[in-house]
Amino acid sequence: MRRVHIIGNLHMGPTNQGNGQGYSSGGFIADSRVDSIVSTGSQQQWYTRDSNVGVWYDGVWNTVFSGVAGAPPQSFPAPPDTTVATTPVSREKPYLYIDSTGKYRVFVPSLDRKSVV
């Protein structure tokens, strides 16, 4: 998920077939805000970058945060959270948008260094 604002909780683990958290295998959040709780459920690998979260909960094998306000403290390997205060270098993918005249345009983000929310 990129560039979203979730007002409330965000639960990222499916519930299915009476199997509690279900099965899920990882994901990514960037340039986003979650006002309340993020629960990754059974996610096994996860990367969150340059975002703001209320409270982070769960994660199974390897959860990485860079430049994330509200991230859990560095604690690898137990629990398996790797937390870095800034994102050293990143570049977002280009994306389409509609300008003020209704025309489609392509925005190409610039290189970002040492970003932090």
Residue spans for each PLM region:
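Sequence-level preference for short, compositionally simple segments enriched
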Residues: 1-117
